[in-house]
């Protein structure tokens, strides 16, 4: 009986733990850390290369091809021209491989960057917290100076990430 109790206690202590080894949660007004990741084509994406040039929309999501993540990605796809008209670069990030991202991109005709973050190194730099055993889902809008101007955190509302980010970007471009 004691073993069962200890197992249950151990299981739930990790199930509800918000994350591990994550840095400070970045918020509005913070400068994003510099990072470099490979995109779905194997090309390097360096965050500093966009400073003073583009607005960045960086969205972290748990898994390619899962229901909510696919809905989120397709929502960004369906409104991609609105983002590009405002001078924004959209980048989805998770720990999937370059190859997995390429398949996801091709399957859903995604026109934006999908960045591979092995070990969730960049996710941790942003302080995105895990939800249960899954990677967190958060979207950051970053202005041309590298400062976060908007952060949206909702694990179950994939489509709303795009909607909220687009509202902010439209206000920025007025």
Residue ranges of each PLM-predicted region?
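Positively charged n-region of N-terminal signal peptides that target proteins for export
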Residues: 1-4
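Short active-site neighborhood of thiol/selenol oxidoreductases, capturing the structured segment around
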Residues: 47-71, 76
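Structural microenvironment flanking redox-active thiols in thiol-disulfide oxidoreductases
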Residues: 70-108, 119-124
């Amino acid at each position: 009986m004691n073993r069962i109790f200890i197992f249950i206690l151990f299981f739930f202590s990790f199930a509800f733990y918000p994350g591990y080894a994550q840095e400070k949660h970045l918020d509005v007004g913070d400068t994003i850390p510099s990072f470099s990741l490979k995109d779905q084509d194997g090309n390097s994406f360096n965050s500093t290369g966009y400073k003073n040039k583009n607005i960045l929309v960086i969205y972290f999501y748990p898994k390619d091809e899962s229901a909510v993540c696919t809905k989120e990605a397709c929502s960004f796809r369906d409104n991609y021209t609105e983002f590009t008209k405002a001078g924004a670069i959209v980048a989805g990030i998770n720990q999937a491989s370059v190859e997995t991202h390429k398949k996801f991109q091709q399957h859903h005709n995604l026109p934006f960057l999908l960045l591979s973050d092995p070990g969730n190194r960049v996710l941790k730099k942003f302080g995105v917290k895990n939800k249960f055993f899954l990677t967190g889902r958060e979207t950051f809008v970053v202005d041309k100076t590298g400062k976060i101007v908007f952060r949206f955190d909702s694990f179950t509302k994939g489509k709303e990430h795009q909607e909220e980010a687009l509202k902010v970007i439209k206000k920025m471009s007025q």
